[in-house]
């Protein structure tokens, strides 16, 4: 669904810190920190993951999954145009 690296990249594109992402998503700061520290796909309960993805989408972030159109063919993020 989303990786820790995608979370960090999305925050960088938005110019926000972990605390601000926690506020936007309705999740706790420790939850955001734990999710971002994941080496691969973030593990968590479905509700938390959905809150995170919805908050990023509302801010204009598009998640790029493996195998979709990107320069590298790997996961990433971009701002919707």
Model-derived features with residue positions:
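Residue-level recognition of specific faces of alpha-helices
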Residues: 6, 31-34, 76
């Amino acid at each position: 669904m989303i990786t820790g690296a995608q979370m960090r990249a999305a925050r960088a594109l938005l110019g926000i810190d972990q605390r601000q992402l926690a506020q936007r998503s309705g999740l706790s700061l420790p939850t955001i920190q734990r999710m971002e520290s994941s080496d691969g796909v973030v593990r968590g309960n479905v509700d938390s993951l959905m809150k995170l993805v919805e908050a990023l989408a509302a801010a204009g972030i598009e998640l790029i999954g493996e195998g979709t159109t990107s320069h590298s063919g790997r996961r990433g993020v971009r701002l919707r145009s």
